[in-house]
Curated annotation (Swiss-Prot):
Catalytic activity: a 6-(alpha-D-glucosaminyl)-1-(1,2-diacyl-sn-glycero-3-phospho)-1D-myo-inositol(in) = a 6-(alpha-D-glucosaminyl)-1-(1,2-diacyl-sn-glycero-3-phospho)-1D-myo-inositol(out); 6-(alpha-D-glucosaminyl)-(1-octadecanoyl,2-(9Z)-octadecenoyl-sn-glycero-3-phospho)-1D-myo-inositol(in) = 6-(alpha-D-glucosaminyl)-(1-octadecanoyl,2-(9Z)-octadecenoyl-sn-glycero-3-phospho)-1D-myo-inositol(out); a 1,2-diacyl-sn-glycero-3-phospho-(1D-myo-inositol)(in) = a 1,2-diacyl-sn-glycero-3-phospho-(1D-myo-inositol)(out); a 1,2-diacyl-sn-glycero-3-phosphocholine(in) = a 1,2-diacyl-sn-glycero-3-phosphocholine(out)
Induction or repression: Up-regulated by cisplatin.
Annotated tissue distribution: Ubiquitously expressed.
Subcellular location as annotated: Endoplasmic reticulum membrane
Transmembrane portions of the chain: 11-31, 285-305, 325-342, 347-364, 403-423, 429-449
InterPro entries named among the record's database cross-references: CLPTM1
Family: Belongs to the CLPTM1 family.
Topological domains, Cytoplasmic: 1-10, 306-324, 365-402, 450-538
Protein name as annotated: Lipid scramblase CLPTM1L
Membrane side Extracellular: residue ranges: 32-284, 343-346, 424-428
Pfam families attached to this UniProt entry: CLPTM1
GO molecular function per UniProt: phospholipid scramblase activity
């Protein structure tokens, strides 16, 4: 049995190593491009000729531009310098068609200075929608006074039935890039990702590619979107520019394609936005480090999950285990799942949280020795009996919870009342769930203390799932490293460090109460027997 479990763990680790190595090789193939080695079949950069360029941004309601009619010039950058970074905010007129739930497009032209873009044969251009369709976020109000952050005009208020309909939202950012590397491509092995952004021209006997213009769609975040009302006539648009290297450009193209594929598979704009958040404003080297850390986090999560399930599957007795702590973990994971559901969190986060909540419910069933009988559609619960040793553990557990309640309940009630008076919510249910989840994050570690108290009273830690604890501890320390780097709620950030304190106390108790390796555990095994047991021979 032991060798089988060990072999499975080795297999998982082996597959993980192969996956990491393969991913590194694929990433290397994306960011590295082999330059042209000879003179034949080489494609030279047009930017190397140092042309005088101009950047022009137009808006129109049409997705295909046939002529210069019905377009508005919103930004004109003369003497455009590819090497110079800039950011400018302009006011864009919103046409009536767009205000009536229509779409507005931006046309970005990079052309020779002093020449209109549609008269320049060497111009490059891209088109990007400045609007997107989304279901508007429910309005948050003060539940006691009924006041909201933005008081709507009565004429603009929509009926309740229309609140779930997608409406046009404004994208206030337009991020532009130009590939500034004077890279010489090999015409026989052009990367497919960059090729679709390239426009080639013949100058004498040499083929040149015009400046590669790119729109960074990953910078468009859901949190920045603005609802377009019928009374809106102008909206701000921040146009930013920065040069980009060939390696980063290829990587960004692949990432945008991946996000687009998610949307094609049915992911909503909000789900795709969760993925965008990983890449926006992130250094490539830090992004690579994040990938490796996330990969190890996933491995430790799986190993902790496997060992935790294995431990509880064989668990027949609750001697030395805090039932209150098990109940609390179940309650907290269910509350966090409902909170994520109320916040309309991405399925990438919601599904694992739901699986974790289901597992904690199963643990409660094991801890309470609960058997469920179905009489038609009505369930009937039957609870098992506890032994004398289990009742002693339960007595210590109840004693710890009694002392803990004197501190915990006033803090939770006070926090809930404070949030009700000062914070706006969508509904009473939203306030209730937020109050619970804030209590879980802020004071949840206190519910780990009954297990420490039981360990202290019994002078033993042999009953705890130490393998699962170890893997979870690795993940906790990984979370600490990124707690002040990755964007997350402050309460969740503090929760990362509070778990460290409790785990260090667990380690101290393990040192203080060493496990007797000669003692037979509840499964009829001892550590020394496992080590000295000879293989069976027929």
């Amino acid at each position: 049995m032991w060798s089988g479990r060990s072999s499975f763990t080795s297999l998982v680790v082996g597959v993980f190593v192969v996956y990491v190595v393969h991913t590194c090789w694929v990433m290397y193939g994306i960011v590295y491009t082999r330059p042209c080695s000879g003179d034949a079949n080489c494609i030279q950069p047009y930017l190397a000729r140092r042309p005088k360029l101009q950047l022009s941004v137009y808006t129109t309601t049409r997705s295909h531009l046939g002529a210069e009619n019905n377009i508005d010039l919103v930004l004109n950058v003369e003497d455009f310098d590819v090497e110079s970074k800039f950011e400018r905010t302009v006011n864009v007129s919103v046409p009536k068609k767009t205000r009536n739930n229509g779409t507005l497009y931006a046309y970005i032209f990079l052309h020779h200075a002093g020449v209109l873009p549609w008269h320049d044969g060497k111009q490059v251009h891209l088109v990007s929608p400045l609007t997107t369709y989304m279901v508007p976020k429910p309005e948050e109000i003060n539940l006691l006074t009924g006041e909201s952050d933005t008081q709507q005009i009565e004429a603009e208020k929509k009926p309740t039935s229309a609140l779930d309909e997608p409406v046009s939202h404004w994208r206030p950012r337009l991020a532009l890039n130009v590939m500034a590397d004077n890279f010489v491509f090999d015409g026989s092995s052009l990367p497919a990702d960059v090729h679709r952004y390239m426009k080639m021209i013949q100058l004498g006997k040499t083929v040149h590619y015009l400046p590669i213009l790119f729109i960074d769609q990953l910078s468009n975040r859901v949190k920045d979107l603005m609802v377009i009302n019928r009374s809106t006539t102008e909206l701000p648009l921040t146009v930013s520019y920065d040069k980009v290297s060939l390696g980063r450009l290829r990587f960004w193209i692949h990432m945008q394609d991946a996000v687009y594929s998610l949307q094609q598979f049915g992911f909503s704009e909000k789900d795709a936005d969760e993925v965008k958040g990983i890449f926006v404003d992130t250094n490539l080297y830090f992004l690579a480090l994040t990938f490796f850390v996330a990969a190890f986090h996933l491995l430790f999560d799986f190993l902790a999950f496997k060992n935790d399930i294995s431990f509880w599957k064989k668990k027949k007795s609750m001697i030395g285990m805090s039932t209150k702590a098990v109940l609390w973990r179940c309650f907290s994971t269910v509350v966090i799942f409902l909170f994520l559901l109320d916040e309309q969190t991405s399925l990438l986060v919601l599904v694992p949280a739901g699986v974790g909540a289901a597992i904690e419910l199963w643990k409660v069933k094991k801890a309470l020795k609960m058997t469920i009988f179905w009489r038609g559609l009505m369930p009937e619960f039957q609870f098992g009996t506890y032994s004398e040793s289990e009742r002693k553990t339960e007595e210590y557990d109840t004693q710890a919870m009694k002392y803990l309640s004197y501190l915990l309940y006033p803090l939770c009630v006070g926090g809930a009342v404070y949030s009700l008076l000062n914070i706006k919510y969508k509904s009473w249910y939203s306030w209730l769930i937020n109050s619970f989840v804030n209590g879980v994050y802020a004071f949840g570690f206190l519910f780990m203390l009954p297990q420490l108290f039981v360990n202290y009273k019994l002078k033993s830690v042999a009953h705890l799932p130490w393998k699962a604890f170890t893997y979870k501890a690795f993940n906790t320390f990984i979370d600490d490293v990124f707690a002040f780097i990755i964007t997350m709620p402050t309460s969740h950030r503090l929760a990362c460090f509070r778990d460290d304190v409790v785990f260090l106390v667990y380690l101290y108790q393990r040192w203080l109460y060493p496990v007797d390796k000669r003692r037979v555990n509840e499964f009829g095994e001892s550590y020394e027997e496992k080590a000295t047991r000879a293989p069976h021979t027929d």
